[in-house]
C-alpha cells in the first residue's frame, strides 16, 4: 500500500484545502525507514502534499523544488494526521503542514512552475 487512508477531505476555497489522514502500518514507505523505528520519509510527505494539491485545488503547475522544509516530529505508523494546503498562485508556491494533535509535525514551501 502506497497511499494513506483519507478519512476526510475539504476544499475551503480555490487556494486552501485540508485532509485528515491515517497512516496504516502497512504503508510501503515505512519499510526500512528505519528498522525497528519506522517513520514516514520526508520525500513522501512532500509527494503527498503535491498529489493532494493537484487533486483538491486543481493545480496544474509542475514541481520546481523545495524552498523550505522543517521536520519537527516524526510521523509514525497508525497516526492520524491533518494535512493543510495553501496555494499561492501569484507566487507559484504551495505551502503545506502536517499536524498531529494540534502540533505541527512538518511544514514546508514548494516552488512550482507552469
Spans of features found by a protein language model:
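Hydrophobic beta-strand-centered segment that forms part of the acyl-chain substrate-binding groove
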Residues: 50-84, 89
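Catalytic strand-loop segment that frames the active site of acyl-thioester-processing enzymes
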Residues: 2-40
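Acidic, aromatic-enriched beta-alpha/helix-loop junctions
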Residues: 35-56
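A broad structural signal for short, well-ordered beta-strand segments within beta-sheet-rich domains
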Residues: 6-7, 63-66, 105
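Hydrophobic residues in beta-strands and at strand termini
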Residues: 21-23, 71, 112
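Generic "edge-of-domain/loop-turn" microfeature
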Residues: 26-28, 39, 76, 90-92, ...
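HotDog/MaoC-like acyl-thioester-processing domains
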Residues: 4-5, 12-16, 86-114
Amino acid at each position: 500500500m502506497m497511499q494513506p487512508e483519507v478519512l476526510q477531505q475539504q476544499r475551503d476555497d480555490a487556494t486552501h484545502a485540508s485532509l485528515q489522514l491515517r497512516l496504516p502500518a502497512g504503508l510501503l514507505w515505512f519499510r526500512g525507514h528505519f528498522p525497528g523505528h519506522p517513520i514516514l520519509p520526508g520525500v513522501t510527505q512532500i509527494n503527498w502534499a503535491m498529489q493532494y494539491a493537484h487533486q483538491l485545488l486543481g493545480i496544474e503547475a509542475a514541481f520546481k523544488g523545495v524552498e523550505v522544509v522543517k521536520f519537527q516530529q516524526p510521523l509514525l505508523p497508525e497516526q492520524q494526521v491533518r494535512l493543510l494546503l495553501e496555494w499561492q498562485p501569484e507566487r507559484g508556491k504551495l505551502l503545506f503542514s502536517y499536524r498531529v494533535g494540534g502540533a505541527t509535525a512538518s511544514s514546508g514551501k514548494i516552488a512550482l512552475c507552469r
